[in-house]
Amino acid sequence: MTSKTKIDEIDVSIIRALQKDARTNFADIAKDCKVSLDTISKRFRRMRRTGVARGTTILLNPKNFGYDCVASFEIRVDYPHIEDVVDFVGKMPEIVFSTSSIGRYNIFAIAILKNVGRLGQLKESIQGHPMVREVAASIWVDEILLCPENFEFEHVKKK
């Protein structure tokens, strides 16, 4: 059993500030919290050490990179093959996140797509795996901000 890390209002203020902008200056957070810069630095280091904060990141808007839509896939597979299918789906170039889940579907995945037409093709590719029983797809319609590590920048020219 893992023990929960205790956090207080100052820790929450640090987290909220960094969620809004990962580049927020610790001095500004300290001023807002009415504590010293050293307090904020130590608390952030503690949150990193204990795993509360695993890092800071940038949010990307896929539409600014020429992607028309973001879609989620819910996939039902036979139980002993979940990890195999998670790996299979995760290797597809458009998939930026895949994980096992609990519920009607065993796997959840997120894809960024150049166009809506690609949705059906990707769904068919997933459905083509012999252990996949069902695939449901949904297109996200609201503002989309992602921070996946494996976001593809295929159109960027290499130097």
Each predicted region: which residue ranges?
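A compositional/biophysical signature of low hydrophobicity enriched in polar/charged and small residues
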Residues: 1-159
